[in-house]
Design a protein with these regions (language model features):
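Phosphate-interaction motifs
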Residues: 2-240
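Glycine-rich beta-strand-to-loop/alpha-helix junction loops that act as flexible
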Residues: 169, 255-256, 313-331, 338, ...
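Phosphate-binding glycine-rich loops and their immediate beta-loop-alpha structural context
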Residues: 205-316
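Flexible glycine/proline-rich
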Residues: 101, 105, 128, 194, ...
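Short beta-strand segments
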Residues: 166-168, 197, 221, 252-255, ...
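Solvent-exposed alpha-helices and their adjacent loops that cap or buttress functional pockets
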Residues: 127-129, 154-160, 173-174, 187-189, ...
Length: 475
């Protein structure tokens, strides 16, 4: 299966887009050796440079550490696909208990209908004109009344046979009218009588009452996502408010004493990249952000935050490993949380976790490295939030990889790619601490253990802005 919207060919109008993508590829792939020429066999440069079949170490510190870990440690981590399934199921019972909310049309965009959308009126609710012209009765020629009929006005007087009246698009059709003659299809003679310039059919250009639906018809089922078009349909059908599944409430806790909130990195301190990135990304997943708090490496502050948060989901950044200031595991044990996923067989992002703090509250612990955190978002947070928001799982799709992607020997890899026609082009700068690749990407390719060769189909995870535009991140 290929990506939605993939084009079979290109024309001159596509050239600007092509040039942009080529510039992106040049920037994101620079510094990683010369690009393979069009006629060069996949992997030939790697072989010439002495790179053999073993996986390339994009982030050697992380991979060496875990490749050397005991086999039983590797097997404690949850396989990637299973982790996504567990995350989606974890919130299923909670989602069923969440009562719907009534929201105005202005606040409903991006929500999911909690009840079917049923027409409150016939659409249209009266016979109306589909065009500017004349409402006519019987065969022509017709005597034209002096007054006209405008949209939004009261019901006009009925027409007698042989009469016509000027009418505007959307106006109520007078009783007795048999058709609407378009302005460009009629003319008046010196006596003021209207003549058609072409044959006119009975009922022509009249929108009959109930043409689109009758009162009580189901227009959309429960579970439909509220798009701009749905808002328009709801308004036309008589709605001021909609019954919707409430947005999951999410609190983001940024951990780490080394993080700066402004300026350039200095003296061993680094900028916090996740604080600006996570809230809009989570909104694109259907969440309402109730708070963003910076906790530092304070265990007691983390404990207070976890035990007082009103959120349905708490997302933490960093602190999920076993270092001297990695407090997430000890605090979860202290509060008696159920650890549902403790490590996932995926790179980057292996030390992510999912815990149930209360029957109605979960925690997703993301690694502190930015791309590893993105991996955790898509692996654990997205399925859980999708379930809470009442959204259906997206239809999986695949594209052929244009280049060989080296794999991890045991774990799935998530690799940033750009979509080029019927191919996914892997991007470099895909180490766990890097954002340069994902910033240029359309999707993440799911690369199985051992890697994938050029031409092999890979499942793709769309990024919110690629699938629905940047506005998807600002609901």
């Amino acid at each position: 299966m290929t990506a939605p919207g993939v084009r079979d060919g290109q024309n001159a109008a596509d050239l600007d887009e092509d040039r942009y993508v080529e510039e992106v590829l040049a920037l994101v792939n620079e510094g990683n050796g010369p690009a393979r020429s069009a006629g060069e066999a996949p992997g030939s440069r790697e072989a010439a440079a002495g790179h053999h079949a073993h996986p390339r170490q994009d982030h050697p510190g992380e991979d060496r550490h875990h490749e050397d870990r005991p086999r039983e440690d590797r097997h404690r981590a949850t396989p990637w696909a299973e982790a996504r399934t567990l995350a989606g199921r974890a919130a299923r019972s909670l989602a069923a208990r969440r009562p719907p909310v009534s929201v105005t049309l202005g606040d409903a965009l991006g929500l999911v209908l909690a009840a079917p959308l049923t027409a409150l009126t016939d659409l249209p609710s009266f016979d109306s004109s589909a065009m500017d012209g004349w409402a006519v009765s019987g065969p022509g020629p017709w005597a034209v009344r002096d007054e006209g009929v405008l949209a939004g006005h009261a019901e006009p007087a009925p027409l007698a046979d042989g009469e016509a009246v000027r009418i505007a698009t959307g106006a109520r059709v007078p009783g007795g009218a048999t058709a609407v003659l378009r302005s460009e299809h009629g003319h008046t003679d010196e006596k003021g009588r209207l003549h058609p310039t072409r044959e006119i059919q009975h009922g022509q250009d009249i929108r009959p009452r109930g043409q689109e639906c009758r009162r009580g018809d189901q227009l959309l089922p429960a579970g439909a996502v509220v798009t701009p078009a749905v808002l328009g349909l709801a308004a036309a059908a008589g709605y001021d408010t909609l019954a919707a599944v409430p947005r999951p409430r999410v609190e983001v806790l940024v951990l780490g004493d080394e993080l700066l909130t402004e300026g350039r990195p200095h003296d061993g301190l680094i900028r916090d990249a996740l604080g600006p990135m996570l809230p809009p990304w989570l909104r694109a997943m259907g969440a309402e952000i109730v708070a963003l708090r910076r906790i530092g490496d304070d265990a007691e502050a983390l404990h207070r935050a976890l035990t007082t948060s009103p959120a349905d989901l708490i997302v933490t950044t960093g602190g999920t490993a076993a270092g001297p200031v990695d407090h997430v595991h000890p605090i979860l044990r202290r509060i008696g949380a159920d650890l549902l996923v403790d490590g996932v067989q995926v790179r980057p992002g292996h030390p992510m976790l999912l815990a149930r703090l209360k029957p109605e509250q979960h925690l997703v612990g993301l690694p502190g490295n930015p791309l590893a955190a993105v991996s955790g978002l898509l692996t654990l947070a997205e399925p859980l939030l999708r379930t809470l928001a009442g959204r259906a799982a997206p239809e999986p799709y695949t594209l052929a990889l244009r280049e060989t992607v080296h794999g991890h020997p045991y774990d799935t890899r998530l690799v940033p790619v750009v979509l080029r026609g019927v191919h996914a082009v892997p991007l470099h700068y895909n180490g766990p601490a890097m954002l340069r690749g994902i910033a240029a990407a359309d999707a993440l390719a799911v690369v199985p253990p051992g890697g994938a060769r050029a031409g092999q189909e890979a499942e793709l995870l769309d990024l919110p802005w690629a699938a629905a535009g940047i506005g998807a991140c600002s609901f």
